[in-house]
Amino acid sequence: MIWHVQNENFILDSTRILMKAFHLLLFHGSFIFPECILIFGLILLLMIDSTSDQKDRPWFYFISSTSLVMSITALLFRWKEEPIISFSGNFQTNNFNEIFQFLILLCSTLCIPLSVEYIECTEMAITEFLLFVLTATLGGMFLCGANDLITIFVAPECFSLCSYLLSGYTKRDVRSNEATTKYLLMGGASSSILVHGFSWLYGSSGGEIELQEIVNGLINTQMYNSPGISIALISTTVGIGFKLSPAPFHQWTPDVYEGSPTPVVAFLSVTSKVAASASATRIFDIPFYFSSNEWHLLLEILAILSMILGNLIAITQTSMKRMLAYSSIGQIGYVIIGIIVGDSNDGYASMITYMLFYISMNLGTFARIVSFGLRTGTDNIRDYAGLYTKDPFLALSSALCLLSLGGLPPLAGFFGKLYLFWCGWQAGLYFLVSIGLLTSVVSIYYYLKIIKLLMTGRNQEITPHVRNYRRSPLRSNNSIEWSMTVCVIASTIPGISMNPILAIAQDTLF
C-alpha cells in the first residue's frame, strides 16, 4: 500500500515538472530556440543509441552536425532583433550574447569532423563523446546569455563537468587520468571561490541576483565602495581566471592539453575561452561598474603575466600540445586587452574579431596535430622535421595557421592583432600594448622554428616517423582535411577583407 502511494506521488510530481517545463518552453521557447535545437539533437542521439542494436556511426555525426548547423541558422535569422530578457530575468538575448553563441557553435561544428578519424582509430565510444560535446556547447551558450548569478554559476558548471569527462575519455591512458584529476580538483576549487564572490555581491546588493538589479541594489545600500565588493571582485576574478587560464591561473592548462585526447583539447582550447570571455565582459562591466579602476588593474596584471610567461615558456617546449597550451596563455593576454578597453573604443569589437580569427588559427593547427599523430603516434616537435616531403598539403596548411597565430601580414592574425592593439593604444594602454607587441615578436620565433622543421629537406634531419609516414586509407580522412581547409581559408582570406567582419563585430555592442 505504501509503495503504491509513493509511486502515485512520484508520477504526480513528474507530471507537474513536465507540465512546468512544457509551459516554460511554450512561452519562452522562442527566446532560446537555438538551444532547444541542441536539446532536441541530444534527445535524438540518446533515443537512437538506446534503440539501435547496430550502431551506424555516420548517423551520429550527421545528427550532431545538423543540430549545430540548424542552431547557427536560427541565430542568424534572429540577428538584429531587439534585446529581450526572458525566464523572469534569468536569460538575456541580444546581439552581443548571440555573437559569442555563434562562435561557440562554430567551434563545435568544426571540432566534430576533426574528431571522426581519431574516434575510429582509437575505438572511443562515439555516442558519449558527441553527447558531452553538445552538452558542453549548450552550457556555453546558456552562459553567454546568462543574466543572473545563479545561471552564471550553473551554466559553466554544465560546461565544466562535460570538459572533465571529455579530458578523461581515454581511461586507459595514465596521462589522461592525471590531467582529469588536476582539472577536476582545480576546477572545483575555482568554482567554490567564484560562488564565494557571488555571495558577497548578493549580500551587498540587498539580496539581488540579476546583474542590473545588483547595481541598483548597491546604490540603494550604499555598499558599492565597501570592502565586501573588493572581496567579491578578487574572488570573481580568480574564478573566471581559471576558465580563461591566464597566468597565474594557468597551472592546469599544459597538463590537460598534453594528457587529453587531441580533439578534446581542440574543443576546449577555444570554446572555454569564448564562453568565459562573454561572461567576464558582462560581470565586470555591470555588477562591478563602480570598481572599474580596480578590475582594470587586476586584468592588466593578468594580461602582462600571460603575454610574458606564456610566450617565453612556449619557446622551451618539446611537445606540440604543450607548446600550444602556453601559446594559448599568451593569446588570452591579448584578448584581455579588449576586455579592459570595453565598448568605449571598440574594445569588445576588436576582441570578438580576434577571437574569430583565433578559432580558425588554433583549430587548423590542432587538425594538423590530430592528422600527424594518428599516422605517426608522436607529438614531439622534432618529429615533424621534413613533413613537407611526405605531405605538402598538411605542412603548408600548418605553416599558414602558425604564421597567422604569430601575426605575420597579410594573414588574418596580423589584422586581428593590429585592430586589438590599435584599440588598446587609443584607450591609453600604452604599456600593455607595448608588451603585446614585444611578446608577439617572441611568439613568431617559436612558430617559425616549427615551420623550418616542417619544410626541411635534409635527409639527416628527417626523423623515422616522417620517413615511415603514410596517408590514412580511412574514408573519414576527408573530414579532417575539410576542417583544416576551412580553418586555413579563415586564417588567410579575412585579413584581406576586414571591413565586413569589423562592421558585424561593432554591431554586437550592448
From Swiss-Prot:
UniProt function note: NDH shuttles electrons from NAD(P)H:plastoquinone, via FMN and iron-sulfur (Fe-S) centers, to quinones in the photosynthetic chain and possibly in a chloroplast respiratory chain. The immediate electron acceptor for the enzyme in this species is believed to be plastoquinone. Couples the redox reaction to proton translocation, and thus conserves the redox energy in a proton gradient.
First-listed, main subcellular location of the protein, grouped into a coarse class: plastid
Topology relative to the membrane: Multi-pass membrane protein
GO terms assigned for molecular function: NADH dehydrogenase (ubiquinone) activity; quinone binding
PANTHER family linked: NADH DEHYDROGENASE
Quaternary structure annotation from Swiss-Prot or TrEMBL: NDH is composed of at least 16 different subunits, 5 of which are encoded in the nucleus.
Gene name as annotated: ndhB
Record-annotated membrane-spanning stretches: 24-44, 59-79, 99-119, 124-144, 149-169, 183-203, 295-315, 323-343, 347-367, 395-415, 418-438
A Pfam family it matches: Proton_antipo_M
Locations listed in the record: Plastid, Chloroplast thylakoid membrane
EC number: 7.1.1.-
Catalytic activity: a plastoquinone + NADH + (n+1) H(+)(in) = a plastoquinol + NAD(+) + n H(+)(out); a plastoquinone + NADPH + (n+1) H(+)(in) = a plastoquinol + NADP(+) + n H(+)(out)
A Gene Ontology BP annotation from the UniProt entry: photosynthesis, light reaction
Top-level division of the source organism's lineage: Eukaryota
Family to which the UniProt record says this protein belongs: Belongs to the complex I subunit 2 family.
A GO CC term attached to the entry: chloroplast thylakoid membrane
Keywords assigned: Chloroplast, Membrane, NAD, NADP, Plastid, Plastoquinone, Quinone, Thylakoid, Translocase, Transmembrane, Transmembrane helix, Transport
Lineage summary: Eukaryota, Viridiplantae, Streptophyta, Embryophyta, Tracheophyta
UniProt protein name: NAD(P)H-quinone oxidoreductase subunit 2, chloroplastic
Repeat in keyword set: no
